Amino acid sequence: MLSLVYHKSVPRYLLMRAGAKRIKNLETGRFSPLQLEDAPEPELPTPEWIRVKPLLSGICGSDLGTLSSDNSPYFSPITSPPFVMGHEVVGVVTDDNSGFRAGERVVLEPALGCAVRGIDPPCPYCASGRHALCLNVAKGDVSPGIQTGFCRDTGGGWTQRTLVAHPSQLHRVPEDLSDEATVALEPLACAVHAALKTNPGPDDTTLVIGAGNIGLFTVAALRRLTDAGRIICVAKHERQREEALRLGADEIVHPKRTYADLPEMLGTEAMRPELGKPVVTGGAEKVFECVGSAGTIEDALRLTKPGGKVSLVGMPGAKSSLDLTALWHKEVTLSGAYAYGVEEYKGERTSSFDLAMRIAPQVRLETMIGPRFRLEEYREAIAAARSAGREGHVKVVFDHRGIRH
């Protein structure tokens, strides 16, 4: 039984950094840190842990960044290679344990917080339900790892075998929610958290920069869970533009027209400095940056009105130069929106995952899944994920059910 295992080394890291974008298939070739191999089943760290057989596993932008070494070395002390990759997972429980029955379908909440690690009392963040912000991600019953799929002890979703999960990580899936819809719940939960954390009002103009799956899901969450008024989405490809409108955006702008069209749409103007990008005097009240590149982060700051808020939803890459003058001059508030947790929604405290499940039927997540690949086709799968926007895909997945489309 095969798994896709990430083996980190300094030479491989440097090779990927230098050549992954220039040399075709380097990140899945002979010298790649990702290798298809017969990895053993992970052991249960403690008796209450549960074994889960993945059905579908998504390919996330953070996975692609890991393979190409574009991710920041910030995460190096809080991950533990070699690890089986994959944190977007719908699967079935294999044995009766900890209140779960064999055959039950579950979606994984991959954060490895205090409860997962057997740490009691929990840190303040875990105690408040914000497990993704856990202070103890390098301590306890399992090796360092911010999430399943980045920890050597848990396994991950890119496997024909099983992964192991603490019962606190598992959410039962309603029967009427398909595997395809369920595998997208984890990124949708991230978008739910981002939308509610910034929570635009009806008088706000909200700008979403980026229309990959996290940008599209952010549009969906904003429209369904907040009172957001006008939503503008920056989307490059035809499928992305269509999906953004379907999910609730009012207007679409092509990235190449960012400074040509957006200032007028936002009721402001752009002025040309001697060097660099245009200076925008006004802007949107709330901006969600869903790409993670230095260029789009800078765009977000420049396109926010004075006193406005920018939510950094896309995972930033390795360090690069970034002009923060607009943040300083316009007194913009920049905050991160990482993963998920417990949300305050209409007077109730509930998890981001529960809210994601609540809106999933309206979003029609299953229509956004595909193509699907067997694990042995991982080279084609990674290539498809890399070109997803251009090829009209939203979420590329590994299908462990023996079905190929």
Per-range role (PLM):
Residues 267-277, 281, 320-371, 379-380:
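C-terminal substrate-binding/catalytic core of Rossmann-like NAD(P)-dependent dehydrogenases/reductases
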Residues 76, 87, 114-209:
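NAD(P)H dinucleotide-binding glycine-rich loop of Rossmann-like/cofactor-binding domains
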Residues 17, 275, 298-301, 350-405:
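C-terminal hydrophobic helical "lid"/dimerization subdomain
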Residues 1-85, 160-162, 401-405:
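Short N-terminal strand-loop motif that marks the start
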Residues 205-211, 223-295:
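Adenosine-nucleotide cofactor-binding segment
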Residues 40-57, 72-127, 174-176:
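Glycine-rich beta-strand-centered segment in the early N-terminal region that forms part
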Residues 286, 302-320, 334:
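ADP-ribose/adenylate-binding Rossmann-like module
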Residues 210-214, 315:
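Glycine-rich Rossmann-fold phosphate-binding loop(s) that bind the pyrophosphate
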